[in-house]
Amino acid sequence: MMTASLAGCIGQEEEEEASDWLFIGDSDIEGWDTAQFMNSTNIGDGGSMCSDTLSTIDEVLEEYNPIHVVIVCGENDLSEERTVEETFEDFQAIINKIIESGALVTYMGTKPEPETTELHAQYRDYDSSIQDFAINLATDSSAPLNVVDVYQGFEDIGNPDSLYQEDQLHLSLEGYDYWDQWLVQVSNDSECIIWQSQQCRITIE
């Protein structure tokens, strides 16, 4: 797995192709200042669903040829009354296409947003399906998909309102600070499959 540290992502004299990060998905990606990741491209689109990402992923991969893709999608699908199974099916198809292109993938999981408590059970079921998928994809030597368990990570620190904007839905700067830390940490652990808070919860066996 490609490794990265925040220091290593800033100012290193490396070829662009060797440090190419692509951030795709919904408003959580769109609102994330990802410039600290060297040669990164952020094409997040507010309101985007997994079904939207799937419809464009072939063209996106051809255009950007990323080394590492960071994806957020699913919450909007579930809020539009798509089922967990339908949403996961689209997610799985996206990930398979990314892996086939040769890129690694990190999924930033759903959030325990105060505004969407009626969806939280579905969020957890969805994330559980993705975590199982990531475990099944892993081999003895690599984890092509790793998952940051954002939901449980936020719960571990009490899920304070300060993690969110006033709408209690979108992330605040404090919330994104945790995302920055967790993405750097999981990217630096080549054997990690599931990351939670400050440690790897499931690794390659």
Residue ranges and their predicted role:
Residues 100-104, 143:
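A short helix->loop->beta-strand "cap" motif at the edges of active sites that frequently abuts
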Residues 111:
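Carbohydrate-associated surface elements
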